[in-house]
């Protein structure tokens, strides 16, 4: 694979130059992102097995100028969660809406009200993203479906903000179930926590990057990203 080839090149370079003190371990992370391979590696003892004291990683970003490095101390990338909402109503013929419990109308209300978590429930000083990314319902023009499905992602830097989102989602989903007289189920999946850099390691990484690209190509206080990594 491309990643495997890159690791081999780095290994050969480090072996041939050896212009550093100490040891370097090159880690290939399986199941990157979706399955959380980073956490599994730590749980299985990779850091203890090879006596790894610090971990450095590079995240490629296509919109960053070639050769430029961005980093910062503290939280730099957000934590990423997923949510799934199932709206269960009563389907029926589109000509007789009074005989149905329309999940689409309820789903629209839920999606609109979810937007108020950021605009009305959150402290404006706290960073938060709540994005609805999928809505699915129905398969034909003249039938009210029984189900509607809403999926999306939440990005936070703070656990208290994460818990606020969960609380408000539960209230919104429950409230719409009562309002429309149908069933709504929320499944909230906590994903990767925020990426947090220690100040000492940021200094080390920034100095190394300056040796490669020059002082003007390194920003060691770049600002936070709402993207996430495991």
Placement of each model-derived feature along the sequence:
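Metal-dependent amide/peptide-bond hydrolase catalytic core
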Residues: 104-230
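Histidine/acidic-residue-rich, glycine-tolerant segments that coordinate divalent metal ions
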Residues: 5, 14-145, 225-229
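Contiguous hydrophobic segments
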Residues: 10, 77-82, 86, 168-175
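Short, small-residue-biased leader/transition segments that mark boundaries at the very start
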Residues: 2-9
């Amino acid at each position: 694979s491309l990643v495997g080839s890159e690791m081999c090149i780095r290994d050969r370079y480090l072996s041939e130059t050896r212009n550093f003190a100490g040891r370097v371990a090159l880690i290939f992370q399986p199941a990157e992102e979706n399955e959380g391979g980073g956490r599994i590696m730590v749980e299985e003892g990779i850091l203890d097995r090879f006596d790894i004291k610090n971990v450095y990683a590079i995240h490629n970003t296509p919109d960053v100028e070639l050769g430029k490095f961005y980093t910062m101390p503290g939280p730099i990338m957000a934590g990423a969660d997923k949510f799934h909402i199932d709206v269960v109503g009563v389907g029926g013929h589109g000509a007789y809406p009074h005989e149905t419990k329309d999940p689409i109308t309820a789903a629209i209300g839920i999606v609109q009200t979810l937007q108020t978590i950021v605009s009305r429930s959150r402290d404006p000083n706290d960073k938060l993203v709540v994005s609805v990314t999928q809505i699915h319902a129905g398969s034909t023009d003249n039938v009210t479906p029984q189900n509607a499905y809403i999926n999306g992602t939440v990005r936070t830097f703070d656990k208290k903000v994460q818990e606020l989102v969960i609380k408000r989602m539960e209230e919104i989903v429950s409230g719409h179930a009562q309002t429309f007289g149908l069933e709504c189920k929320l499944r909230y999946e906590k994903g990767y926590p925020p990426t947090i850099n220690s100040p000492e390691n940021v200094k080390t990484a920034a100095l190394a990057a300056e040796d490669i690209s020059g002082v003007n190509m390194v920003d060691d206080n770049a600002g936070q990203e709402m993207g996430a990594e495991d």
